[in-house]
């Protein structure tokens, strides 16, 4: 599914096209007032000789999270607010006479309307990335979401990389282009490495490494990490000793291949500090591969701004462990303005650049008509914060209400009983109470799968197929793990992110944190680094497990009644395979599959909202 990511917000179907009539609003986006006051940071940041502000996996969330239900207000700061924060922090670094670097670890595309809501003929993220380029990033690294569509990769190569002056890094990613003689050449999307000096004159060798990604588009190439570290250019790049290595890459700091890069450097430089800024799995995480290194991963969707600091030693032996600190900041104006951080009041906080970025992003939202309103959601619909099925479950809403209604209006077979099966991963983000806009639809349900069906399937066989696809029998579990690994290689991090949420919730139950009624909902991080990483103390989000596949309400017919078995194109192969396990009367093949509707899953919620939420 991720390989078929949203490339264009398609022309809205006639069934729900906007006629600018009553009930539809096209207004300027606004941040909602939080349902409770925001909690300020708990303690000062620890500064060192080297300090890093880190972002990763922003996925277009440049106007912040604008809903009133927690935890959304924790992350309500927009990119303009962040730019002002960075500016003030740079001033503090100068006063302290230390270095402060700004680093990003990739995935700028695919997440909100600012990146994905562009008009036909444009390129995903082209406009939104311009605003990121206005910040003083010292290093940016490529992510897998820059590689699903060749046009996006080319845009990064032609438009973002030049603005970074050699510091947009793609150590193991190439793009295929035609040279002046019209011959194809493979060259790095950005730069393979960068060497530069900090404001204080410290020498830095930087790399930008992506995980072993296999879902990239044609005419792009991702080299395996284990092969990259054997390349002559890599060995030459790390030959000379800098004051520290800066490894900024789109790869999680746990359970992946950073140790391959780390060990290759350690084989040459046994004690040189190595600072790793990872990403991709959307979690807050930290570990130390040795006493002179730290690895930090800073969440997703501008829900986290990471902080890392260390003080270097001048001893020739460099045998002692270094002292590191890390912090996970909630990106909102209370955090940014806090006396522990910038100590700026609301009056003096906003910089000219920050205000310009905010105004530009708001204008982009207007240009893309992102606040076109389909209806008003009566309450929150979340993916994992409530049980499935339930009235507050987005999965229940999508499978049991929205999809059946949308298909009934967009199929020529509505008079035939059907059962609909979709993958729960089709829903990417929660829906919160209040206006449901074009931006909310792009955020919650971005994938462009269409609906297929197999006719004349017994009702019981269809229901058994869903059950079998979700079962955890040993053989099924093995197949599930194999599919999960394949999905991970193609860029799907949902399983790891959900595991992280589950662990967080389980720890809170064991520690009795649920009774802390004075705390607001948010992330509660346990990582492998010393001390407490979270800048603000929260009570963790409740977590309920969800199945991989969900179904509509079964039709009110007998079990042997022949029905239309409807499903999204993403699950075709697995569904046909499972059909042949749960029954033996017929050998199903892909030849039995036909198009049920050209309606895309990304359109379903808008159709339903116009019907039910007005």
Model regions and ranges:
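N-terminal catalytic scaffold of extracellular/periplasmic and nuclease hydrolases
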Residues: 2, 16-307, 312-317, 388-414, ...
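Non-catalytic terminal accessory segments
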Residues: 16-53, 74-77, 87, 91-100, ...
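Glycine-rich, flexible beta-strand/loop modules in the N-terminal catalytic cores of phosphate-handling
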Residues: 329
């Amino acid at each position: 599914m991720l390989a078929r990511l949203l490339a264009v917000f398609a022309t809205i179907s006639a069934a729900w096209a906007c006629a600018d009539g009553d009930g539809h609003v096209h207004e300027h986006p606004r941040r909602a007032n939080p349902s409770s006051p925001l909690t300020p940071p708990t303690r000062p940041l620890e500064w060192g000789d080297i300090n890093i502000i880190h972002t990763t996996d922003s996925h277009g969330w440049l106007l912040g999270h604008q809903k009133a239900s927690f935890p959304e207000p924790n992350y309500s700061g927009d990119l303009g607010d962040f730019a002002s924060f960075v500016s003030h922090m740079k001033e503090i670094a100068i006063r302290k006479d230390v270095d402060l670097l700004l680093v990003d670890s990739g995935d700028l595309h695919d997440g909100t309307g600012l990146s994905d809501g562009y008009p036909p003929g444009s390129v995903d993220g082209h406009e939104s990335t311009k605003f990121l380029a206005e910040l003083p990033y010292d290093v940016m690294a490529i992510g897998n979401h820059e590689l699903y569509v060749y046009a996006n990769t080319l845009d990064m190569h032609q438009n973002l990389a030049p603005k970074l002056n050699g510091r947009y890094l793609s150590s193991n990613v190439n793009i295929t282009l035609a040279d002046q003689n019209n011959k194809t050449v493979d060259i790095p999307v950005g730069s393979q490495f960068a060497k530069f000096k900090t404001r204080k004159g410290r020498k830095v060798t930087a790399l930008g490494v992506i995980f072993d990604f296999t879902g990239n588009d044609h005419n792009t190439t991702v080299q395996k990490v284990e092969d990259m570290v054997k390349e002559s250019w890599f060995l030459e790049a790390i030959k000379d000793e800098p004051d520290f290595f800066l490894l900024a890459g789109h790869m999680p700091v746990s359970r992946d291949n950073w140790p391959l890069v780390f060990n290759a450097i350690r084989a040459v430089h046994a004690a040189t500090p190595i600072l790793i800024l990872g990403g991709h799995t959307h979690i807050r995480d930290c570990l130390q591969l040795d006493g002179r290194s730290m690895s930090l991963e800073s969440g997703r969707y501008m829900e986290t701004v990471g902080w890392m600091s260390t003080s270097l030693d001048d001893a020739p032996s460099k045998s002692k462990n270094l002292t590191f600190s890390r912090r996970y900041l909630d990106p909102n104006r209370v955090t940014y303005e806090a006396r522990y951080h910038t100590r700026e009041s609301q009056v003096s906080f906003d910089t000219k650049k920050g205000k310009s970025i905010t105004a530009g992003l708001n204008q982009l939202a207007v240009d893309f008509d992102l606040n076109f309103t389909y209806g008003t959601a009566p309450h929150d619909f979340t993916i994992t914060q409530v049980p499935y099925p339930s009235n507050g479950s987005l999965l229940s809403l999508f499978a049991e209400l929205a999809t059946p209604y949308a298909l009934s209006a967009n199929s020529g077979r509505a008079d035939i009983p059907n059962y609909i099966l979709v993958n729960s991963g089709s829903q990417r983000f929660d829906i919160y109470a209040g206006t449901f806009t074009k931006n909310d639809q792009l955020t919650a349900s971005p994938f462009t799968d269409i609906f297929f069906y197999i006719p004349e399937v017994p009702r019981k066989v269809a229901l058994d197929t869903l059950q079998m696809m979700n079962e955890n029998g040993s053989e099924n579990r093995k197949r599930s793990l194999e599919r999960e690994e394949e999905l991970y290689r193609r860029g799907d991090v949902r399983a790891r992110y959900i595991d992280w949420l589950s662990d967080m919730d389980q720890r809170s139950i064991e520690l009795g944190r649920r009774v802390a009624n004075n705390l607001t909902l948010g992330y509660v991080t346990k990582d492998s680094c010393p001390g407490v990483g979270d800048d603000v103390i929260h009570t963790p989000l409740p977590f309920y497990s969800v199945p991989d596949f969900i179904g509509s309400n079964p039709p009110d017919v007998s079990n042997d009644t022949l029905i239309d078995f409807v499903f999204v194109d993403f699950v075709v192969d697995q569904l046909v395979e499972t059909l042949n396990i749960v029954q033996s009367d017929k050998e199903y093949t892909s030849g039995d599959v036909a198009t049920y509707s050209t309606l895309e899953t990304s359109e379903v919620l808008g159709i339903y909202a116009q019907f039910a939420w007005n």
